[in-house]
Swiss-Prot record:
Entry protein name: Putative peroxisomal biogenesis factor 19
Family: Belongs to the peroxin-19 family.
Organism: Dictyostelium discoideum
InterPro entries per UniProt: Pex19, Pex19_C_sf
Organism lineage: Eukaryota, Amoebozoa, Evosea, Eumycetozoa, Dictyostelia
GO MF term set: peroxisome membrane targeting sequence binding
Length: 335
């Protein structure tokens, strides 16, 4: 082994020993720093300089303090307005806030209009319902001593009728009809021409509502339910002649359905799924049961039949249209 090899071997051994030396740890109140002294050894051999590798010190910094979700949320909420004030200015921020409130209230008012009120009666319609209830109470001879009680019994029925789309308020027409009734009949009662006309208009509106398939599908069912409650155990105070005319109109309508509905079902059975045609047949059975009641028992109609009718849902649109056309034709012929 020559001198150069001996020197190189010594340098390698020295470098290995330096790497294995223990590190010195210095502790302060804030940070802990671990360093390894940088040792530089210079050995001159035949004018050659050898410098061992240097180990760089590492610094272990403590992690920043963590904030919980609640702390961050509170910080954001508390500082948000201050940040907006600095960016926009306090006056601009106030104007924006006032503008937001104005637009918000405007949207709320627009959504509360009758057209966007989910089909519910507006405040104006509710007032008209009260007025109509008073007129109906007078027309039907309702008094505090009658079985019907006060006119509040009419209001749920009228409100449901409004929801179903079957009641249009026209004060001029209503007042004219009321005045004509008073002229034609000094006693309290319903003028049959006006009554039939109103029923016809109501049927048309109900059919249109059903054919449009609006979101208020429960409106007609609720209408039947309230009509059932109104009729249950109540005796309308009507003049004998007028009572007979109203009963005749009711019986003719039921008779038409009992006679024509089964044939219509058979002709259109292929146009509907089996579960629908089964529902139609159940409806037809109810109409037949009502039609078979003895004459003079219309005012004692079993409310359970009306409840079952309500549960079975609406009549088919095309059958309703045929029924309405027939009723309108009969009214035109009478006029």
């Amino acid at each position: 082994m020559n001198l150069d090899d001996l020197l190189n071997s010594a340098l390698d051994e020295l470098e290995t020993q330096e790497k294995e030396q223990p590190t010195t740890t210095k502790t302060t109140t804030t940070t802990t720093t671990t360093t390894t002294s940088n040792t530089t050894k210079t050995i001159n051999n035949n004018n050659n300089t050898v410098t061992p590798s240097t180990i760089k010190p590492t610094y272990n910094k403590p992690p920043p303090p963590s904030l919980g979700n609640d702390d961050l949320l509170n910080t954001n909420v508390n500082d948000m307005m201050d940040i907006f004030k600095k960016l926009l200015g306090e006056e601009t921020l106030k104007n924006l806030d006032a503008g937001f409130d104005k637009e918000y209230n405007k949207d709320i008012n627009n959504n509360s209009d009758d057209s966007n009120n989910g089909g519910l009666p507006s405040e104006e319609d509710k007032k008209k319902i009260d007025e109509l209830a008073e007129k109906l109470a007078t027309m039907f001879g309702v008094s505090e001593d009658s079985d019907l009680g006060d006119m509040d019994n009419f209001k749920p029925f009228l409100e449901e009728l409004t929801k179903a789309g079957g009641l249009n308020f026209n004060n001029d027409e209503l007042n004219n009809n009321s005045n004509n009734n008073n002229k034609n009949n000094n006693n309290s009662g319903v003028h049959i021409d006006n009554f039939e006309s109103s029923i016809s208009d109501t049927l048309k509106n109900l059919a249109d509502n059903a054919s449009n398939k609006t979101d208020n599908n429960g409106g007609i069912d609720d209408l039947f339910s309230n009509l059932s409650k109104l009729m249950e155990g109540q005796n309308f105070n009507l003049d004998g002649e007028e009572t007979g005319q109203i009963n005749d109109l009711f019986e003719e309508s039921i008779q038409f359905m009992a006679e024509n509905y089964p044939d219509w079902i058979e002709k259109n059975i292929d146009h509907y799924p089996p579960e629908e045609t089964e529902r139609f047949k159940n409806q037809s059975e109810i109409f037949s049961m009502i039609a078979q009641q003895k004459e003079g028992e219309a005012d004692m109609l079993d409310s359970g039949l009306l409840a079952r009718m309500s549960q079975l849902g609406n009549l088919p649109d095309s059958f309703c249209e045929d029924s309405i056309k027939k009723v309108e034709t009969e009214i035109d012929e009478k006029e």
